[in-house]
Amino acid sequence: VPHEGEEFGFVLDGKITLTLGKKKYVCRRGESFYYSADRTHKISNESNAKARFIWISSPPNF
């Protein structure tokens, strides 16, 4: 759900899929991501392996 703010993340292990609007990006261990939260976004793990990441939201809405 779009909302005010910005979001940043860093993948610690595995890989995640970041969906921004209609585009999908795969982020792997050691990679980071950033986006303006005012558009549709989703973070998911589309594999059977575990994934861990740090997620920072500003302002802290959740």
Q: Model-found features: residue ranges?
A:
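Ligand-binding loop in jelly-roll beta-barrel domains
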Residues: 28, 37-62
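Short beta-strand/loop turn elements enriched in aromatics
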Residues: 1-5, 56-59
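Conserved beta-strand segments that form the floor/walls of ligand-binding pockets within enzyme
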Residues: 10, 34, 55
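Short beta-strand segments in beta-sandwich/barrel cores
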Residues: 14-19, 32-33, 41
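Short secondary-structure boundary/capping segments
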Residues: 1, 8, 24-25, 45
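Generic detection of intrinsically disordered/low-complexity segments and helix-coil linkers/edges
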Residues: 4, 19, 28-29, 49
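Short, conserved beta-strand element in jelly-roll/cupin
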Residues: 3-18
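Short acidic-glycine-tyrosine-enriched beta hairpin
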Residues: 21-36
